[in-house]
Every structure is written in structure tokens, then in C-alpha cells.
């Protein structure tokens, strides 16, 4: 019997590598569960998929329309709140709008006036939430949760493997790594 099972895949635009102990012959099954979990989270939160919660919040920015969110999304937003506060607002998932203002080498492509207008669309505090929904207050605002969702996804896969009584595993998503055993 093969001692380990592994798979390489992409999630959230990053290379992933999963290795699980196959001592009980369930390695392939467990990898499929992990792959399904990553796909579920990507479909739900990726900024680049049009039907995700994130994209729907971005599409409704400035309309006053709240996009329904579940407990998992509220929990992720709470986690991001903590990151935003701990970083003294340096970490801010609403800065994606600024990425086109600069070249890959850091040169400013937008005029100072354009940049000033775009900076008015930045601010995590402008993601307004209720118990059932969320929306961005300003038209043109957008959030990008990909930098937050990768560690969350890594932890989610690790918890899934622990729930399935896996004793040894290695989970890598780009530069984020977790292990069991």
C-alpha cells in the first residue's frame, strides 16, 4: 500500500500541494475532500469569480443593497476587522482599487488627482454589515479578500483532515504552510 497520497493544484490563483498519510487507504478520498473544500471557499470568496460573495458585494457598492452573508462570512469579516485594527489600518482589503495606479516597478501611472479620488474609495470601515448582510457604502469601492482567505482556507483544510483523524499531512498554498503530525 502507498504510504502517502499527494496532489498539486491551484486555488485562489496560487499553487497548492497537499500530502496526506495513506496508512488506512483513504488518502485519495481525503485529498478529494480537501480539493472540494478549497473549491468551495474559492467559489464563495474569490474576488475574481463573478458569483462569489466578494464579487457581489463589489458589484453592489454604493447602491445601499445588502448582500446576504452567512456565519462563515461574518466570521471572516470579524477576523479581518482584527487584522485591520492590529495593523492600525495599514492592512486594508479595500486597497485593490489602487493596484492599477502603479506600475509593477512602483511608478505612479495615475495622475495625483486620479489617485486622490481613488483614495476616497479606500477604507475597510466602509464595509457596512448587519446580522444578515453586507455592502460597501461608496460607488466604485471594492474589497479583495484573497490575501485573507488563503490562510483561512489552509486552516479549514487542516481542520477537515483532523476531523477525519489524519495523523500526518502537509498542506502548502504558495508561501503559506500547515502540517499535522
Language-model region placement:
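A contiguous, well-ordered beta/alpha segment that forms the leading edge of an enzyme domain
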Residues: 1-146, 159-170
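Short, electropositive, low-hydrophobicity segments enriched in small/polar residues
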Residues: 17, 155, 178
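Conserved acidic catalytic centers in enzymes
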Residues: 88, 150, 174
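A conserved glycine-rich
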Residues: 147-157
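Beta-rich nucleic-acid/ligand-interaction surfaces
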Residues: 175-181
Amino acid at each position: 500500500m502507498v504510504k502517502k497520497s499527494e496532489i498539486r493544484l491551484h486555488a485562489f490563483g496560487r499553487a497548492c500541494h497537499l500530502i496526506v498519510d495513506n496508512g488506512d487507504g483513504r488518502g485519495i478520498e481525503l485529498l478529494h475532500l480537501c480539493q472540494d473544500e478549497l473549491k468551495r471557499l474559492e467559489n464563495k470568496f474569490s474576488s475574481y469569480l463573478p458569483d462569489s460573495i466578494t464579487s457581489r458585494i463589489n458589484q453592489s457598492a454604493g447602491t445601499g443593497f445588502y448582500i446576504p452573508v452567512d456565519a462563515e462570512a461574518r466570521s471572516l469579516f470579524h477576523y479581518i476587522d482584527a487584522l485591520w485594527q492590529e495593523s492600525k489600518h495599514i492592512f486594508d482589503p479595500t486597497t485593490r482599487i489602487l493596484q492599477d495606479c502603479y506600475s509593477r516597478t512602483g511608478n505612479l501611472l495615475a495622475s495625483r488627482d486620479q489617485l486622490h479620488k481613488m483614495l476616497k474609495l479606500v477604507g475597510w470601515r466602509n464595509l457596512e454589515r448587519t446580522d444578515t448582510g453586507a455592502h460597501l457604502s461608496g460607488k466604485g469601492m471594492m474589497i479583495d479578500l484573497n490575501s485573507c482567505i488563503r490562510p483561512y482556507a489552509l486552516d479549514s483544510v487542516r481542520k477537515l483532515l483532523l476531523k477525519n483523524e489524519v495523523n500526518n499531512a502537509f498542506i502548502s498554498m504558495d508561501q503559506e504552510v500547515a502540517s499535522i503530525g
